[in-house]
Amino acid sequence: MTVPATRNDLMIVNMGPHHPSMHGVLRLIVTLDGEDVIDCEPILGYLHRGMEKIAENRTIIQYLPYVTRWDYLATMFTEAITVNAPEELGNIQVPRRASYIRVIMLELSRIASHLLWLGPFMADIGAQTPFFYIFRERELLYDLFETATGMRMMHNFFRIGGVAADLPHGWIDKCLDFCDYFLPEVAEYQKLITRNPIFLERVEGVGFIAEEEAINWGLSGPMLRASGIPWDLRKVDHYECYDEFDWEVQWQKEGDSLARYLVRISEMIESVKIIQQALEGIPGGPYENLEARRFDRVRNIEWNDFEYRFISKKPSPTFELSKQELYVRVEAPKGELGIFLIGDNSVFPWRWKIRPPGLINLQILPQLVKRMKLADIMTILGSIDIIMGEVDR
């Protein structure tokens, strides 16, 4: 529904898909009455790659490299949900050490995602300096990822029943050093940004979402928590080993772009607290549990007296998905990332439905920008934090 216009000569403006402030290949058809936004229509699909259909023709391990292309700035979460679904379907237990390693990697990935949200968000509203500051910390994070997984991005590190490799020697000390270094840097961001009068002028009261509205639109993550609802799946669903750590859900009640900024800044501090506790208390033991399961089933996997499945363990171990269905979710940096999986007693999923947080959160954008100024569109869009790889899939 459009807003009533005050004049006859309305202007229609295309923002994107190639726009300096656009977060990926999103196109907005904006109807303007002078500087006031009358209507906004998002056009999606420029980055659609058929990820759900690809999943139906791949084993889980073969599919892992694809999922890192959804939200390519927080790839650990897409990997986590991809292995969590078959783990729950097959009731596979994850060793405690593997669970601790997963939590450490997930929280490091959350910090990296929030950092790369903060820099462009500030650049969108006219503050260029933080954009360069965040890359300083992000480089240190990517060095940690590269040391542990071999890749700076697209890590391909999670496996069914654990992780691909144990933490290398000296990595824990290096990660603890990063945590000690990073906390003062977050304090510096807050000192530079949070009480800056120009910043407050651009974000305070802009893009307001009420509590009931956030629930009705199905929002999740910082979008939901900034509207006064302390809902975090790490506390609600008790997955991995988050219950073993002392940390708080970060939320605000104002519901505007400033509140969403404050939630994400605070979440980075909480992530550091979780990482420090996990590093200091990480147990010994195996980092994956598939080996024992293979030996248990050795009688069933012989073919012409040749145990082919052992040979194929590293490139692509097969794992049959039983004939049942389930929904699995994790708390990604942008919100609730979920998978609806239907098995069919095959190594391939019968259905693999992705619930991307960015797509759901983006639905409220047209309502938020109506009656606002043209310049506020990028502030509001930036505060939502979308990655078009997961929106279009």
From Swiss-Prot:
**Annotated disulfide bonds:** none
Any idea what job this protein has? NDH shuttles electrons from NAD(P)H:plastoquinone, via FMN and iron-sulfur (Fe-S) centers, to quinones in the photosynthetic chain and possibly in a chloroplast respiratory chain. The immediate electron acceptor for the enzyme in this species is believed to be plastoquinone. Couples the redox reaction to proton translocation, and thus conserves the redox energy in a proton gradient.
Supply the PANTHER family for this chain.
Answer: NADH DEHYDROGENASE [UBIQUINONE] IRON-SULFUR PROTEIN 2, MITOCHONDRIAL, NADH-UBIQUINONE OXIDOREDUCTASE 49 KDA SUBUNIT
Q: Which species does this protein come from?
A: Amborella trichopoda
Main enzyme class: translocase
Q: Where in the cell is it found?
A: Plastid, Chloroplast thylakoid membrane
Give me the reactions it catalyses.
Answer: a plastoquinone + NADH + (n+1) H(+)(in) = a plastoquinol + NAD(+) + n H(+)(out); a plastoquinone + NADPH + (n+1) H(+)(in) = a plastoquinol + NADP(+) + n H(+)(out)
Q: Known NCBIfam families for this protein?
A: PRK06075.1, PRK07415.1
The entry's family comment says: Belongs to the complex I 49 kDa subunit family.
A single GO CC term for this protein reads: chloroplast thylakoid membrane
What residue ranges carry the coiled-coil annotation? none
Q: Which protein is depicted?
A: NAD(P)H-quinone oxidoreductase subunit H, chloroplastic
